[in-house]
């Protein structure tokens, strides 16, 4: 199992002799609009708070998240990024058998493997545009004594998403704990696809979110989990460090979730840019482009005249980075993923890709 994170900009920029800001990174799935201006100003205005320990209860941060997600503050757990909560939850549950919706993010399998867990993978199929039939998925879960089901929603890298109605059906018709990673949920219609409002009614549901992607803050390492399961909450909290969220992350979090202007503008802009990229990429006769509810798009080189790794190298020479997806189990060397950047950058990507396919 290989890692399927985005590009390491520090390493790439060093090798190319460039500044990180000179690279157009279509591989990392981070909001190109940056982070909330109000949240950054709050950090500046309160910079002297670094001399004080954070509130160990994180009352104001949890209240901000509660209002944002519509969940009770008592059902919120905080983590140093979503990855810490993924690790903590799987470690606490210590499953013997798990269902993993695949292909997907490598950290899930990595953490499940640490528990010596038998992993039953349900592979979505390209023939179905990577869409998952909820009844087939439920039958797969129930076909074995699985302790836990891991779902990335929307799924990275395929872009498929279960609606919250489908997620409720999964919860009602299975016995396993359900872990849903909603890292990319804000890039789609949360009223249709987010399951946060199911948390208070289903104590077998554990939702994980991070602020790295939509809120453009990978550097502050802030994530949160939502569950009404008291045993899970108490077990995870007892295993986390007392002050696992630093002061700057706390200040930003208290403000960013209330910045409605940033949230609305990001959603509208990136939805529009995703549709632009989907339309333009779909016009390439060499590509099969898969629908997406995330801020990224999975494409397959159906003509097989060139591999994704070769396209990546050509683009890299032009300071453009895309994601070669062969490290995702279930995908081959002809799949690549791009995320949405600003319109000029997206247009340049399309123009450059056209020149590559014309010359092949």
Question: Language-model segments: which ranges?
Answer:
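PLP-dependent aminotransferase class I/II
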Residues: 35-36, 57, 204-283, 287-290
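PLP-dependent enzyme catalytic core of the Aspartate aminotransferase-like
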Residues: 165, 317-318, 327-360
């Amino acid at each position: 199992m290989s890692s399927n994170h985005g590009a390491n900009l520090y390493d790439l920029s060093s090798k190319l002799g460039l500044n990180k800001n000179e690279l157009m990174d279509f591989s990392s799935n981070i909001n190109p609009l940056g982070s909330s201006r109000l949240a950054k100003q709050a950090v500046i205005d309160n910079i002297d708070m670094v001399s004080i320990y954070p509130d160990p209860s994180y009352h104001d941060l949890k209240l901000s998240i509660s209002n944002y997600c519509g969940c009770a503050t008592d059902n919120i757990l905080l983590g140093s990024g979503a990855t810490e909560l993924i690790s903590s939850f799987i470690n606490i549950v210590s499953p013997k058998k798990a269902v993993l919706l695949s292909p997907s993010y490598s950290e899930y399998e990595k953490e499940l493997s640490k528990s010596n867990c038998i992993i039953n993978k349900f592979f979505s199929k390209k023939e179905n545009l990577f869409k998952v039939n909820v009844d087939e998925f439920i039958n797969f879960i129930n076909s074995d004594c699985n302790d836990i089901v891991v779902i990335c929603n929307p799924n990275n890298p395929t872009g498929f998403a279960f609606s919250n109605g489908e997620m409720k059906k999964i919860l009602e018709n299975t016995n396993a704990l359900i872990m849903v990673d909603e890292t990319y949920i804000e890039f789609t219609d949360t009223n249709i696809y987010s399951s946060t409002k199911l948390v208070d009614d289903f104590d077998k549901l554990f939702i994980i979110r991070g602020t790295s992607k939509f809120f453009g803050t990978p550097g502050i390492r802030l994530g949160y989990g939502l569950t009404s399961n008291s045993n899970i909450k108490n077990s995870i909290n007892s295993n986390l460090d007392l002050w696992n969220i630093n002061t700057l992350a706390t200040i930003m979090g208290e403000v960013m979730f209330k910045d409605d202007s940033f949230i609305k503008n990001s959603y509208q802009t990136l939805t529009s840019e995703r549709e632009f990229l989907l339309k333009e990429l779909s016009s390439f006769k060499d590509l099969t482009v898969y629908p997406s509810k995330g801020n990224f798009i999975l494409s397959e080189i159906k003509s097989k005249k060139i591999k994704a790794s070769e396209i990546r190298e050509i683009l890299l020479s032009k300071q453009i980075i895309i994601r070669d997806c062969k490290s995702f189990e279930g995908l081959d060397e002809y799949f690549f993923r791009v995320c949405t950047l600003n319109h000029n950058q997206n247009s340049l990507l399309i123009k450059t890709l056209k020149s590559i396919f014309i010359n092949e």
